[in-house]
């Protein structure tokens, strides 16, 4: 589906009350993180998506700039992430939903509930992140990416992106490395940006998400 102008990979399964799922993994926030194979560090042997789909209508997705979803170079923020989730909930036809957030997804679930309390039937926050160490990690990752861009340029990000897979596994590819690796048209536009303007967007994204 295309939501707010960005391709979003999503999966709706099961029946029952709607359960909007915000996956763990930072910039690896993808549907497969809810499965036994893709989410071993969070779920051990349990296939969370299959289990929950027996009781709920599960709505899971690759968050923008993650997995098979696309992206757009703009200052990232919790508001943008909430807008995407709200559009997905509307697409699913759900009037209300329980919210399940894990890791960074717990922060997004809280942000959604604050902005749309009437849509939230309940919150389940698993393995939430936050605090000084989380902030330090985020700032460090953004700094590594920005230093890489200053030294090597944006074309080097596109070249490295398929090997790095995502920002949380290879900080130097940055938050837009995943769509650059998946979508050639995104990569082609990515390299044409003004570097200084891009670095400013990175800094604003870092501060909005981690400060």
Predicted regions and their residues:
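Catalytic nucleophile-loop/oxyanion-hole region of alpha/beta-hydrolase
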Residues: 69-82
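Conserved acidic catalytic loop of the alpha/beta-hydrolase fold
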Residues: 79-97
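Short beta-strand immediately N-terminal to the catalytic nucleophile in serine-hydrolase-like folds
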Residues: 81, 99-101, 126
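Gly/Ala-rich beta-loop-alpha elbow adjacent to hydrolase catalytic centers
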Residues: 101-105, 109
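Flexible "cap/lid" loop of the alpha/beta hydrolase fold
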Residues: 110, 114-115, 120-151
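Alpha/beta-hydrolase
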Residues: 143-211
């Amino acid at each position: 589906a295309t939501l707010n102008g960005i391709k979003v990979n999503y999966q709706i399964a099961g029946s029952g009350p709607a359960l909007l799922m915000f996956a763990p993994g930072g910039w690896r926030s993808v549907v497969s993180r809810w499965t036994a194979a893709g989410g071993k560090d969070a779920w051990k042997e349990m296939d969370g998506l299959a289990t929950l789909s027996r009781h709920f209508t599960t709505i899971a997705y690759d968050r923008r700039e993650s997995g098979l979803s696309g992206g757009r170079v703009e200052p990232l923020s919790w508001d943008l992430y909430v807008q995407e989730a709200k559009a997905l909930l509307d697409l699913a036809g759900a009037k209300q939903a329980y919210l399940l957030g894990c890791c960074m997804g717990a922060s997004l679930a809280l942000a959604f509930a604050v902005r749309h309390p009437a849509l939230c039937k309940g919150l389940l926050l698993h393995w939430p992140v936050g605090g000084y160490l989380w902030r330090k990690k985020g700032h460090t990752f953004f700094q590594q990416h920005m230093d890489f861009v200053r030294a090597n340029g944006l074309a080097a990000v596109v070249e490295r992106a398929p090997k790095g897979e995502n920002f949380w596994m290879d900080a130097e590819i940055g938050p837009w490395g995943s769509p650059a690796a998946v979508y050639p048209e995104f990569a082609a536009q990515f390299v044409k940006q003004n570097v200084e303007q891009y670095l400013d967007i990175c800094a604003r994204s870092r501060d909005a998400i981690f400060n």
